[in-house]
From Swiss-Prot:
One Pfam family in the UniProt entry: EPSP_synthase
Name this protein carries in UniProt: 3-phosphoshikimate 1-carboxyvinyltransferase
Pathway: Metabolic intermediate biosynthesis; chorismate biosynthesis; chorismate from D-erythrose 4-phosphate and phosphoenolpyruvate: step 6/7
GO cellular component, as recorded: cytoplasm
Species this chain originates from: Bacillus cereus (strain ATCC 14579 / DSM 31 / CCUG 7414 / JCM 2152 / NBRC 15305 / NCIMB 9373 / NCTC 2599 / NRRL B-3711)
Subunit structure: Monomer.
Family that this chain belongs to: Belongs to the EPSP synthase family.
Major location category of this protein: cytoplasm
Record EC number: 2.5.1.19
UniProt gene name: aroA
Length: 429
């Protein structure tokens, strides 16, 4: 369990930074390329542990995948070409891999067993296994399909019209992917619109997808045709440096090639509402996945209320938004964020516990947290608990704190941002 020592940043963070590829898009590019017909080239791929787990799983099913840094080539097998894996499919720490891949495996006529690490073993799978069973999938797991390992014997499925109790792109995507080989029209309706990378990328691969309000539909029997994918930078990774630029004195950062998918840019809306000083320059308007260069500098922030429809658009950024709120004037209330409880950790509890160790005034609620602003942070020993987003949030907090901060289990950040600490060090010079 490696630890990192973070020293206070006295002269601010300054410079340009190219954000690594979007994790959600990288996963999907490998998966969709694997079930497409033809060769897909992916540029800007995120070579983090989670996305490498996706590559490993599809290689195990006979897909020829070549990876060289952030460029990946996938020779697709088509929807019917995957081979029965000889070994257990290990997703590591990746919830995206296990949930989306379950949708693909549910309609593939062979047996597979899927498992992950200790964190995955605690994460709820019934939200995916239940609708897949309704489609006719033979799928099981511990506690009646609630937890991994999952066993899946794929076969013929029937389309369903599913009303999801949660706004989850992973649930929606698993059902849509299962629907590719189901008989009829598969529809998913959500309480709020979740991130739409699956719909955008299916369309890029030639699949017709229909959107009507909060409902997404596709017809079974459509084939995927290989295409080249350019992955923009991950706005969830950019969020840590956006907040750092806003709250660390004497800072000015230019973040290049940040993904600006409107279902993901809640962090931008929140920083604007809090009063942050920044500019957004779109660089590829009209692309399937828009991107921008963002310039941000030290700002005077104010507390706000965050809840409702915006939560699915920033669920992964809430840990670092909470940190920003500790430096804002007034009180920030985050609500409607129950999903935080079923992430890599219970992020309500971990954010509150670890920021409290650093001197923040913050309280947990059932569906979020209340943060009292203008806290003077003091260095301490804190822990990521194996959660990459908690680790990065604590590193930014450490830059601001008085005295040194020691982060235990710091290597967890490699899941989504392998070069994070190197970038932080470079910007602090």
């Amino acid at each position: 369990m490696k630890e990192r020592t973070i020293q206070p940043v006295n002269n601010g963070l300054n410079g340009n930074i190219t954000i690594p590829g979007d994790k959600s898009i990288s996963h999907r590019a490998v998966m969709f390329g694997s079930i497409a017909e033809g060769k897909t080239t992916i540029k800007g791929f995120l070579p983090g542990a989670d996305c490498l787990s996706t590559i490993s799983c599809f290689k195990e099913m006979g897909v020829e995948i070549t990876q060289n840094g952030d460029e990946v080539t996938v020779v697709g097998k088509g929807l019917e070409g995957l081979q029965e894996p000889k070994a257990v499919l290990d997703v590591g720490n990746s919830g995206t891999t296990i949930r989306l891949m379950s949708g693909i495996l549910a309609n593939t006529p062979f047996f597979s067993c899927v498992q992950g690490d200790e964190s995955i073993a605690k994460r709820p799978m019934k939200r995916v296994t239940n609708p897949l069973k309704q489609m006719g999938a033979n799928i099981d797991g511990r506690e009646e399909g609630t937890f991994t390992p999952l066993t899946i014997r794929g076969g013929d499925l029937k389309a369903i019209e599913y009303i999801s109790p949660v706004a989850s792109a992973q649930v929606k995507s698993a059902i849509l992917l299962a629907g590719l080989r189901a008989e009829g029209v598969t529809a998913v309706t959500e309480p709020h619109i979740s991130r739409d990378h699956t719909e955008r990328m299916l369309e890029a691969f030639g699949v017709k997808v229909t959107r009507e309000g909060k409902t997404v539909k596709l017809s079974g029997g459509q084939k995927l045709t290989a295409t080249d994918i350019q992955v923009p930078g991950d706005v969830s990774s950019a969020a840590f440096f956006l907040v750092a630029g806003a709250i660390i004195p004497n800072s000015k950062l230019v973040l290049q090639n940040v993904g600006m998918n409107p279902t993901r840019t809640g962090i931008i809306d929140v920083l604007e509402k809090m009063g942050a000083t920044f500019t957004v320059d779109l660089i590829n308007e009209g692309a399937s996945e828009p991107a921008a260069n963002i310039t941000i500098e030290t700002s005077s922030l104010k507390g706000i209320e965050i809840g409702g429809d915006i939560i699915p658009r920033l669920i992964d950024e809430i840990p670092v938004i909470a940190l920003a709120a500790t430096q804002a004037e007034g009180i920030t209330v985050i609500k409607d964020a129950h999903e935080l409880k079923v992430k890599e950790t219970n992020r309500i509890d971990t954010v509150v516990a670890e920021l409290t160790k650093l001197g923040a005034r913050i309280e947990a609620t059932d569906d979020g947290m209340i943060i009292y602003g203008k806290s003077a942070l003091k260095g301490n020993t804190v822990n990521s608990y194996g959660d990459h987003r908690i680790g990065m949030m604590l590193a930014i907090a450490g830059c601001l704190a008085e005295g040194k901060t020691i982060i235990e289990d710091a290597e967890a950040v490699g899941v989504s941002y392998p070069t994070f600490f190197d970038e932080l060090q470079k910007l602090a010079k």
